[in-house]
Amino acid sequence: MVSREASILDALGAVGSVLVADLARDLGVSEVTIRKDLDALERRQLLRRTRGGAVLPERGEEGAFRDRLHRESAAKRAIAAEAATLVADGDVIALDTSSTAHHLALELLHRQGLVVITQSLPTAMVLLERSDARVIMPGGTLRRESSGLVGPITDALVGRGRIDKAFVGVVGLSPERGLLELATDEAVSKQALVAASDAVHGLFDASKTRGFALHSFARPEQVTSLITDARASDDFVEQWEAVGVPVARVPMPDTETTGTASVQARTGTTRRPTQKEHR
C-alpha cells in the first residue's frame, strides 16, 4: 500500500474520522492530493467521504472484509512487503480473498505485465484501477464475509496453463494437516488454486499460528513457504521446518530484526519439491 494511504487509514482507525486539512498538514502534501487519496480509498470501501474529510464506513455484514483489513494492519503490510519480493514482472499469480493478500496486491501495483487470478472483488478493483495487471476472476457466489466469490473454479483455470505462485491466507494451520480454512466453500476454492499452482505461499499474522479451523486446503507437501511476523514462536518455526517448509518471520515496524529470515534466503535449502472469518 502507498505509505500515505496507510497513514490515512491508521489515523482513521485511531480516531474514527479525519479532516483533509489536517492530513495535508501532517503528511506534507496538498489538500488536492489528499482528496484524491480519500476518493480512491472510498471506491475501495475503506472509508466514507464526508464534507471536508472522511469517517470509518458503517459496519454490517458487508463490513467484515474491511474490519479484517484494518485488524493487525501493520503486520499484514510487513508480510505483504516481504511476499512482494517473490513476484517478478510478468508472473502469473493467484491471490485469495484474504485481507493479507489484498495488502500484497497493493504492493504489486507497479509490477509490469502481471496476470492475477483472484476471487476477491476489492483486490480485483484495486488492480483494475491502479495497475496494468490482467485480472482473471473465476465466477461463483458472492460471499459477504470475504467480499469474494466462492464456488467451483477449476473450469476457469482449464487451458490457461499453470499459476506460477499462489498467495493465500489461513484461519489456522498445522504441520500435520497443512493450511486450514473454517468455511467449506472457501476451502474448496483454495484447493483448486493450490492444485493449479507451482508454488504456494501462506501469508498470515502470528495470531493465526493458534487459529482453529476444520478444512485443509493445502497439504504440508504442497506448501512452498510461510510468511508471518516476528511474533511467531521458535517452536512454530521449528515444527514447520521439520516437515520441510521454511518460515519467514518479518520484523514489525520498530521491532528488532534479530532472528528473522528472508524467504528468498531460505527456500533454496529447505523448500519442498514442487509440488471471526479469516486473516
Tell me the role of every PLM-derived stretch.
Residues 109-113, 184-185:
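A glycine- and small-aliphatic-rich helix-loop capping segment at beta-alpha/alpha-beta transitions
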Residues 2-98, 105-111, 121, 128-132, ...:
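HTH-adjacent hinge/linker in prokaryotic transcriptional regulators
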Residues 113-114, 226:
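Conserved helix-loop-beta element of the AMP-binding
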Residues 115-116, 135:
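Short beta-strand element of Class I
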Residues 3-6, 10-22, 28, 43, ...:
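Conserved phosphate- and dinucleotide-binding cores of soluble alpha/beta proteins
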Residues 63-64, 94, 101, 180, ...:
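Amphipathic, positively biased hydrophobic alpha-helical segments used for protein targeting
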